[in-house]
Amino acid sequence: MNLLITGAWNDAKDHFDEFEKLGHHIEFLQFEKEALPCPYEWVEGVICNGLFLFHAIEKFANLKYIQLTSAGFDRVPMEYVQEHQIEIHNAKGVYSIPMAEFALFGVLELYKRGKVFLQNQTKYCWEKQRDLLELYGKKVCIVGCGSVGTECAKRFLVFGCEVIGVDLFPREDEHYSSMSGLDMLEDILLECDVVVLTLPLTEETNHLMNESRFARMKRGAILVNIARGAIVDTEALIQVLPNLGGVVLDVFEEEPLSAENVLWNMGNAIVTPHNSFVGDGNGKRLSKVILENLYCG
């Protein structure tokens, strides 16, 4: 297969010899915005992240295989892929561990008032905090019970939480005390102390967390979004945030987040630059997924 590999796979060059022994022919594109090093018609398979944001997929007349380095499919014109029966794989499970750790970190940061302690340290201020919360015994709702959501569930269970799942395709799973469909989300929000969003962005999930659903959240509850920014209606969130215990946002409707956005300066908001997926084990896991899919193909 004629493979175009982009710099989205950091360890790609370590495997070129292996690919060639399997009969694949390789062209490499470091930056996906740049011109291709080969004709579009030459390409039969791609390993990429956002290649089709910069190069129309219709130009790849002989494309039959796509391997993404991302967990989501939202940067690919999936209707075209399905119509042309192109085989496609994502990086399922690659980023689940660091993202789950990040979600847990964010909740603990808010419960244990990490911001306050850090600010006091910079001022050499010895001041006890009397309103720290325990994670033990809290009810956590994971919205999106795929690999990322389930890794989150495992970690919250270890801390003694009750974990409830909400998913597009509810099922029985040992990591959740129950799992319901999205149609039950509004009722479930009433009883949960922590809500973690890990589901994909689709037409159905766009602005899933809107004004009416925020109104259903418990006073003092925490929202974590490590999924996609557009799942949350940002303006509605800003309005309700004073009533919440806090919010952990790693993704936003517009990235980078504008310097003028009030979220930067809200005391109970943790704002991070789409960073939750980063971990020192990603490279090994991603290479394993890519190689397994190619071997099976």
Regions found by a protein language model. Give the residues of each.
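NAD(P)-binding Rossmann-fold cofactor-contacting core
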Residues: V158-H175
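Glycine-rich adenosine-cofactor-binding loop
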Residues: G7-W9, K92, L133-L157
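Residues at the starts of beta-strands that form the adenosine-phosphate
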Residues: N2, H25, K139, C161-E162
